[in-house]
Amino acid sequence: MPELPEVETVRRGLEQKLKNFIIKRVEICRESTVAYPIDKIDFIEGLQNSLLYKWNRRGKYLIAELKKTVSNNNDANEISFVENGVLVVHLRMTGYFTFNNTLTNPCKHTRIRLFDNNNNELRYIDVRSFGQMWWVRDGLSPNNIIKGLGTLGPEPFSESFNVNYLKKVISNKTRSIKSILLDQTIIAGIGNIYADESLYSAGISPFREARTINKNEIKRLRRAVVDVLKKSIGAGGTTFSDFRDLEGENGNFGLQTNVYRRTGKKCRQCKNLIERQKISGRSTHWCRKCQK
């Protein structure tokens, strides 16, 4: 599943590529991709004539601010804009966007197509079809409509994600520290890859009970989370299967991982072999010698 760095990479690509992109036509190729509104006609009509004004990210969600075009009754050439809510996207396991400036037939796994006046197309592709989209009209709160969005913990790059916050939320937790990092209600955006890499960088065993992590270790962990995520964003994220950026390019952070998917290979630091074991059903990669 695309995690924070991959979603941030997509957000930056969309923001750069789709300047002045006004949706003139919406084509739904798979109805289940549209999670809200229930009536798909409302989704189509809600997006039509909307400018994709600004792209934001919250955890693993992409959020596009929309502005509706409104013609002046006295002058057809004069167009103004009014707020039109947001388009929210969750890529889930295999979702990604492509931008096409020539008309082409949709590929097999195309789910949603958005066209502008010049027939430029923003195409959403999703092999496993778990990804979802929501159009939330102006005046309604996406947090109240989209399950999971309103319960997200702080962003790793925010001031709220600090040592005191981490100390407070893990102080009485008997769960493993790895499970804590994966809990989106505690920290938004971290998945399996970056939980493993952050714990390795901090020198903390993923199997430790969260409440046993001392203050110095919390400081190291917070710093590791931020550093690892920034490094991955700089590399365009990680591609191990389906993730692509808007230009169809793979992320390059996978070449730089220290433990993730390096089972049986030598630790880059101590030369011990990297091990793999499951925690709460999730594959966990770690170095027994470097992580205590």
UniProtKB/Swiss-Prot annotation:
Pfam assignment, any one: zf-FPG_IleRS
Cofactor(s), by name: Zn(2+)
InterPro entries: DNA_glyclase/AP_lyase_DNA-bd, DNA_glyclase_Znf_dom_DNA_BS, Formamido-pyr_DNA_Glyclase, FPG_cat, MutM-like_N-ter, Ribosomal_uS13-like_H2TH, Znf_DNA_glyclase/AP_lyase, Znf_FPG/IleRS
Secreted keyword on record: no
E.C. number: 3.2.2.23, 4.2.99.18
NCBIfam families in the cross-refs: fpg, PRK01103.1, PRK13945.1
Function, in words: Involved in base excision repair of DNA damaged by oxidation or by mutagenic agents. Acts as a DNA glycosylase that recognizes and removes damaged bases. Has a preference for oxidized purines, such as 7,8-dihydro-8-oxoguanine (8-oxoG). Has AP (apurinic/apyrimidinic) lyase activity and introduces nicks in the DNA strand. Cleaves the DNA backbone by beta-delta elimination to generate a single-strand break at the site of the removed base with both 3'- and 5'-phosphates.
Renumbered zinc finger spans (FPG-type): 258-292
Protein name per the record: Formamidopyrimidine-DNA glycosylase
Binding site for DNA: H109, R128, K173
Family indicated by similarity: Belongs to the FPG family.
A molecular function GO annotation: class I DNA-(apurinic or apyrimidinic site) endonuclease activity
Residue stretches in coiled coil: none
PROSITE patterns, alphabetized: FPG_CAT, ZF_FPG_1, ZF_FPG_2
Cofactor note: Binds 1 zinc ion per subunit.
Organism for this UniProt entry: Prochlorococcus marinus subsp. pastoris (strain CCMP1986 / NIES-2087 / MED4)
CDD domains (UniProt xref): EcFpg-like_N
Keyword set, alphabetical order: DNA damage, DNA repair, DNA-binding, Glycosidase, Hydrolase, Lyase, Metal-binding, Multifunctional enzyme, Zinc, Zinc-finger
